[in-house]
């Protein structure tokens, strides 16, 4: 897709830094994560040697970890056992993950291939190399399994069918193309390249194609000891279906020469019967008809019976059939004439020609050796053509309706082989492996370094072995002919006699390797020094195997078959025509393998390759056995050390500037906007802008002439991760904006609705308060704080109904699943055996049916909540209170039990608590008197007396319980009523709450005012000035009090909704206008000074004052910090805590009363009542608060002019001007300092705004 350019926006928007992300997930310990042994990537080794690589692979292998990386190359060591690492759970673990997020695995390679296909629209392939038995076939199967599972939509039947057929090719082709060898129980005796084609729209498999390479057909007729024929022969003979047994005369594998001569019929770990069932199932999935399956097994039976044809010598020493019944049954299976079959095996027809004229025809009898060779050639020809037809038939089924341009290729080919006797098959197999090694070198080592030079990238060249010289030794035609050319030339020279052709080939070997140091000629043998080791090949029989053509007599025999599958499919007339055409040289086996190998190289070169290098740890195929010398040899010839060195010095990813911009232009606001490409410059400048916007260090990339090179895969994965999250982030941004807009509308609507409901129906919380006050009206003294006009019965003070916070923690821990109508903190009086009663803190939660009394305990240093008592409200007999202002309430049950006894509790909101109980249980009796009775134990009543006292032992705002007596100071009269709610101040809408994210929420201590969550439409009681109707002992408040000079900054910021001193309420004194100088005045005697003002009685502070003896950090939610030696108000005392206010009443909260000591109020508290004095310019200005400076200026400006004598008028004016200038300077400094402090406090505490919303 081409880049769509779009004009840039003309509006310049200031780019702001995004706020810090607050949704960090909690870190969890992975109990199932295994300890890593060695390093997962060999590039991380501290020392790069073959021995270090071997040691690392050995450690991981013994730990059951068989996979290791070299950059993007996967190293696999065959475990020779099932490790259970390919199940559905493992597959899902690697799905959608890059290779750095998960341990090394073949699934990671498969995921990377599929991701690159989707993301970069490039063909992918995986090259699996290694020697025989190293695990190449298993790796290919697992890659096919992974891609088929992750790429298929389960809802699409057609796609699922393609997936099933692709997977079914594995058991089918393994049965016909794999065999047990000395080194491998499931060795591929052919090569295949599977290409899975994907649709361009949804990247699902729509077709596939298999290319076959060089089946080892010699294995059909002979195997070395302890090896087996192809699996299908043992599957068919051991578990043959009944109809085939009767129709084809199938018996056990020991009956047939081709399956029993190597003396290996059974193999550990191979279940031939089960494998045949899988083969038959695969045939059905692929779509082979019953007739096609019958023909396949008819040919298998024919081959088995052909092998049982044996010979004897006749009188002339020629070969004769030992048992005619065998040939007759073979003729029945092939549906040919038995006599023609016998003649084709024991005779050879030779035609002579004389120039252009046809000559004579001779029937030449064959000896036993020659007849055996013809018999085997017939069996090999039938099996080879049958296998090629099966591959073609599979391709017909896998062919899709639509063509796709993008594929994933999986190469599964025979590994490098070195046997005791090596012939033409081994040289072909090793040649293909040399070609694959050459591809690996070209695409990883040579191509990488060549590209660095071309792109002018800084690079240190690394030496490596290029095996092209070995490939040329085998396949070259000119200037120096190679081995394959010499073989073909030998056949052409002596085509009639195989032995003579072998001798000609042996003579030509000296010319082939004369100047090649990787070749050695031996008598009757020759050595090629392959990349994997030196291999000695035998000349005998090579030319005959290279012919790869059936005898004309055999082809003519099979063309007479009455079975169309034989004479039209396996051996069509075109085959006979090509053999009888003497003008055209038939294609040899070496020609075929050379053409196939070069086609394979061309196909792989068009793909983005992935590599898997397999290693065989031992020759005995035993698990947990690791032969160091053998593995070290493989490490050397695979070139792992050079690969590690180049990888460490190279770059993990490179692509053209255009492709990079196309992929990642979204990541920079300068190159992409709303999904469109808006960059106006060239591609290289766009690449620089993208890397800059993504904060990629310059050390992590280099820019070439046409490409950008990324050094580490972590950088690439980071870019890909940002790209994947781009659209999600854009959608989230739009959602946030929309939610802000909707939230503002909803909040505005709720505010209007709340105001209208209050205006129309009244405030329900205040109505509940008035109802509750009526229950105790005239019967109980009241606390001053209960009589505030802003006091409302909000109920859930701990926020138990909220979706988060400490209240939600309470109900979750205790299992409360009912609606909470009241929650708060208080104390309970508990008595223990042999001890006096003790006041213990508790949490009280009231639902519609139950009172929960909850204890906070520390278990293993963790806070736990335990439900101590559950009291049913319907079981309450009465509640008892005293007539004084104390907070004690007794709950008495009809039938108390040890688990639900009567309780004696103390809580600040006792009137509200009782009101809710009365609302829930209207028949509840409320007893108020001088004593309170409740049952400490069932049937044992306890009486508590209440007395009023003013002694110093009684706290101002609490009580003393001792020996069944509660002593409390006098409260407000029982007839007191709440005044009208004060009018709230007007203010602007705080829009910051719609934009600021990540603000820490606070969980305040119990308070007499509701939390922000439970009271959205009410002002806090602290905001209002309280004026109870009856307050005999209250001292009139001064008009304006001076704040105390503090030695430390304020301990906490002012809560946002608390009243703040408005700047316009305190105006600085305007400078006095300079007047025209007055005319000289006649000097007279100065008048007497005015009398001093009368001394007023010292003002009494509104609350007791206490001095802090220690510093207190205020870390507990709802508390206020204390600064040593600073004086504070203490409004009330509850146990060991006091409600503390600063002297300017800007902050309040709870603090330990033991940290405070009562003291006399400071003189600065009554600065407004002191007599005015003439201001004197200080020698050094002192930093004062803004309020004190303004107060001083006001006092100075209010001094009457008549008090200044006429004689000192000029001196007085000069002094006044100097004082005024000093005051202005001091005022400016104070304002500046105040602003700095305010800004600092705002910065320091911006995240804790909600924490200061403390309750009283």
Swiss-Prot record:
Compositionally biased intervals (Acidic residues): 1245-1256
SUPFAM superfamilies documented for this protein: P-loop containing nucleoside triphosphate hydrolases, SH3-domain
Post-translational modification: Phosphorylation of the TEDS site (Ser-360) is required for the polarization of the actin cytoskeleton. Phosphorylation probably activates the myosin-I ATPase activity.
InterPro entries xrefs: Fungal_myosin-I_SH3, Kinesin_motor_dom_sf, Myosin_head_motor_dom-like, Myosin_TH1, MYSc_Myo1, P-loop_NTPase, SH3-like_dom_sf, SH3_domain
Residues annotated to bind ATP: 130-137
SH3 domain segment(s): 1101-1161
Region of interest (Disordered), residue spans: 1-24, 965-1101, 1164-1210, 1232-1256
GO biological process, one term: actin filament organization
Superkingdom classification of source: Eukaryota
Chain positions found as Phosphoserine: 360
Location of the Myosin motor domain: 37-724
Biased composition (Low complexity): 1054-1065, 1188-1205
Annotated ranges, domain IQ: 728-748, 749-774
GO CC field: actin cortical patch; cell cortex of cell tip; mating projection tip; medial cortex; myosin I complex; plasma membrane raft; prospore membrane
Segments of skewed composition (Polar residues): 1012-1028
Biased composition (Basic residues): 1-12
Subcellular location field: Cytoplasm, Cytoskeleton, Actin patch
Keywords noted in UniProt: Actin-binding, ATP-binding, Cytoplasm, Cytoskeleton, Hydrolase, Motor protein, Myosin, Nucleotide-binding, Phosphoprotein, Repeat, SH3 domain
Residue ranges occupied by any TH1 domain in the UniProt entry: 782-971
MF (Gene Ontology): actin filament binding; Arp2/3 complex binding; ATP binding; hydrolase activity; microfilament motor activity
Biased composition (Pro residues): 1077-1095
Region (Actin-binding): 407-490
Family to which the UniProt record says this protein belongs: Belongs to the TRAFAC class myosin-kinesin ATPase superfamily. Myosin family.
Description of its domains: The myosin motor domain displays actin-stimulated ATPase activity and generates a mechanochemical force.
Function of the molecule: Type-I myosin implicated in the organization of the actin cytoskeleton. Required for proper actin cytoskeleton polarization. At the cell cortex, assembles in patch-like structures together with proteins from the actin-polymerizing machinery and promotes actin assembly. Functions as actin nucleation-promoting factor (NPF) for the Arp2/3 complex.
UniProt-recorded name of the protein: Myosin-1
Organism placement in taxonomy: Eukaryota, Fungi, Dikarya, Ascomycota, Saccharomycotina
Gene: MYO1
């Amino acid at each position: 897709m081409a880049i769509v350019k779009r004009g840039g926006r003309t509006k310049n928007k200031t780019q702001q830094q995004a706020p810090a992300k607050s949704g960090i997930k909690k870190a969890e310990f992975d109990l199932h994560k295994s300890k890593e042994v060695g390093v997962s990537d060999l590039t991380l080794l501290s020392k790069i040697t073959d021995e270090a690589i071997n040691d690392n692979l050995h450690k991981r292998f013994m730990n059951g970890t068989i996979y290791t990386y070299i950059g993007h190359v996967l190293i696999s060591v065959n475990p020779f056992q099932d490790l259970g690492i390919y199940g559905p759970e493992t597959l899902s673990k690697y799905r959608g993950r890059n290779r750095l997020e998960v341990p090394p695995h073949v699934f990671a390679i498969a995921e990377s291939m599929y991701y690159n296909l989707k993301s970069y629209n490039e063909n992918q392939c995986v090259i699996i190399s290694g020697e025989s038995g190293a695990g190449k076939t298993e790796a290919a199967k697992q890659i096919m399994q992974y891609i088929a599972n992750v790429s298929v939509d389960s809802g699409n039947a057609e796609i699922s069918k393609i997936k099933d057929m692709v997977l079914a090719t594995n058991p089918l082709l393994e049965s016909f193309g794999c065999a047990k060898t000395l080194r491998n129980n499931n060795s591929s005796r052919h090569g295949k390249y599977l290409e899975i084609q994907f649709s361009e729209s949804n990247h699902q498999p729509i077709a596939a194609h298999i290319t076959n390479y060089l089946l080892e057909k010699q294995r059909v007729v002979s195997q070395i000891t302890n090896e087996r024929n192809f699996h299908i022969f043992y599957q068919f003979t051991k578990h043959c279906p009944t109809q085939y047994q009767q129709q084809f005369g199938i018996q056990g594998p020991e009956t047939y020469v081709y399956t029993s001569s190597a003396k290996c019929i059974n193999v550990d770990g191979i279940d031939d019967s089960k494998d045949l069932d899988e083969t038959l199932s695969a045939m059905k999935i692929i779509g082979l008809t019953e007739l096609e399956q019958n023909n396949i097994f008819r040919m298998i039976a024919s081959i088995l019976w052909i092998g049982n044809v044996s010979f004897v010598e006749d009188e002339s020493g020629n070969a004769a059939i030992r048992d005619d019944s065998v040939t007759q049954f073979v003729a029945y299976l092939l549906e040919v004439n038995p006599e023609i079959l016998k003649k084709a095996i024991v005779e050879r027809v030779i035609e002579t020609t004389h120039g252009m004229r046809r000559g004579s025809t001779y029937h030449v009898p064959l000896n036993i050796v020659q007849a055996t060779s013809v018999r085997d050639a017939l069996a090999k020809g039938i099996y080879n053509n049958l296998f090629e037809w099966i591959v073609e038939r599979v391709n017909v089924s896998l062919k899709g309706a639509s063509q796709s341009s993008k594929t994933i290729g999986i190469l599964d080919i025979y590994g490098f082989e070195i046997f005791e006797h090596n012939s033409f098959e081994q040289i072909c197999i090793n040649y293909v492996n040399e070609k694959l090694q050459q591809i690996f070198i070209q695409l990883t080592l040579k191509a990488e370094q060549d590209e660095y030079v071309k792109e002018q990238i800084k690079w240190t060249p690394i030496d490596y072995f290029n095996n092209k010289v070995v490939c040329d030794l085998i396949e070259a035609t000119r200037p120096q002919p190679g081995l394959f050319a010499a073989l073909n030339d030998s056949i052409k020279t002596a085509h009639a006699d195989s032995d003579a052709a072998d001798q000609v080939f042996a003579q030509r070997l000296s010319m082939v390797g004369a100047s090649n140091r990787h070749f050695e000629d031996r008598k009757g043998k020759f050595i090629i020094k392959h990349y994997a080791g030196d291999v000695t090949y035998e000349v005998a029989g090579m030319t005959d195997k290279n012919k790869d053509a059936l005898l004309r007599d055999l082809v003519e025999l099979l063309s007479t078959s009455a079975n169309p599958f034989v004479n039209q499919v396996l051996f069509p007339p075109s085959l006979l025509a090509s053999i009888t055409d003497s003008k055209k040289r038939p294609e040899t086996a070496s020609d075929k393998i050379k053409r196939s190998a070069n086609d394979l190289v061309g196909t792989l070169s068009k793909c983005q390759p992935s590599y898997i290098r397999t290693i065989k740890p031992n020759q005995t195929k035993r698990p947990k056995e690791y032969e160091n010398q053998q593995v070290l040899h493989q490490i050397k010839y695979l070139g792992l050390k050079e690969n590690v060195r180049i990888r460490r010095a190279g770059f993990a990813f490179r692509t053209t500037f255009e492709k990079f911009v196309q992929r990642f232009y979204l990541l920079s606001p300068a190159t992409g906007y709303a999904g469109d490409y808006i960059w106006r410059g060239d591609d290289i400048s766009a690449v620089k802008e993208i890397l800059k916007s993504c904060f990629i260090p310059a050390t992590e990339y280099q820019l070439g002439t046409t490409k950008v090179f990324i050094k580490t895969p972590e950088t690439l994965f980071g870019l890909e991760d940002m790209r994947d999250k781009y659209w999600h982030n854009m959608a989230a941004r739009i959602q946030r904006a929309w939610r802000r807009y909707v939230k503002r509308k909803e909040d505005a609507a709720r505010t209007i609705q709340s105001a209208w409901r209050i205006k129309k129906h009244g405030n329900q919380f205040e109505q509940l308060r008035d109802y509750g006050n009526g229950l105790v009206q005239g019967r109980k003294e009241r606390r001053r704080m209960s009589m505030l006009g802003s006091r409302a019965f909000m109920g859930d003070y701990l926020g138990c109904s909220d979706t988060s916070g400490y209240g939600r923690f309470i109900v979750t821990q205790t299992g409360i699943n009912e609606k909470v109508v009241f929650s708060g903190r208080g104390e309970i009086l508990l008595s223990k055996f042999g001890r006096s009663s003790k006041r213990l803190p508790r949490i009280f939660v009231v639902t519609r049916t139950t009172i929960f009394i909850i204890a906070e305990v520390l278990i293993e240093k963790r806070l736990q909540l335990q439900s101590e008592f559950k009291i049913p409200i319907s079981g309450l007999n009465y509640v008892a209170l005293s007539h004084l202002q104390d907070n004690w309430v007794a709950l008495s049950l009809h039938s108390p039990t040890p688990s639900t006894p009567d309780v004696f509790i103390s809580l600040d909101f006792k009137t509200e608590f009782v009101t809710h109980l009365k609302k829930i249980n209207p028949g509840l009796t409320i007893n108020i008197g001088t004593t309170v009775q409740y049952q400490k134990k069932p049937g044992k009543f306890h009486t508590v007396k209440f007395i009023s006292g003013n002694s110093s032992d009684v706290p101002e705002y609490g009580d003393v319980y001792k020996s069944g007596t509660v002593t409390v100071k006098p409260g407000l009269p029982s007839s007191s009523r709440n005044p009208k709610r004060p009018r709230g101040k007007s203010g602007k809408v705080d829009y910051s709450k719609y934009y600021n994210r990540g603000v820490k929420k606070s969980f305040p201590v119990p308070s007499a005012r509701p939390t922000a969550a439970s009271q959205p439409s009410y002002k806090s009681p602290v905001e209002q000035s309280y004026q109870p109707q009856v307050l005999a002992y209250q001292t009139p408040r001064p008009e304006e009090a001076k704040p105390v000079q503090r030695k430390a900054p304020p301990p906490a910021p002012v809560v946002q909704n608390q009243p703040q001193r408005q700047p316009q309420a305190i105006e600085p004194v305007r400078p006095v206008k300079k007047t025209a100088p007055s005319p000289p005045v006649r000097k007279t005697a100065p008048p007497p000074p005015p009398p001093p003002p009368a001394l007023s009685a010292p003002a009494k502070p509104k609350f007791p004052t206490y001095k802090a003896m220690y510093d207190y950090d205020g870390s507990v939610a709802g508390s206020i910090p204390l600064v040593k030696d600073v004086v504070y108000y203490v409004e009330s005392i509850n146990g060991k805590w006091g409600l503390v206010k600063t002297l300017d009443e800007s902050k309040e909260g709870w603090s330990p009363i033991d940290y405070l000591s009562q003291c006399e109020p400071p003189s600065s508290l009554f600065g407004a009542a002191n007599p005015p004095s003439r201001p004197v310019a200080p020698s050094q200005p002192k930093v004062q608060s803004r309020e004190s400076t303004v107060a001083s200026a006001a006092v100075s400006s209010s001094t009457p002019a008549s008090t200044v004598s006429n004689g000192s008028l000029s001196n007085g004016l000069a002094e006044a001007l100097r004082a005024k200038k000093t005051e202005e300077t001091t005022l400016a400094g104070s304002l500046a300092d105040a602003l700095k402090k305010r800004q600092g406090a705002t910065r320091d505490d911006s995240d804790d705004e909600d924490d200061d919303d403390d309750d009283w």
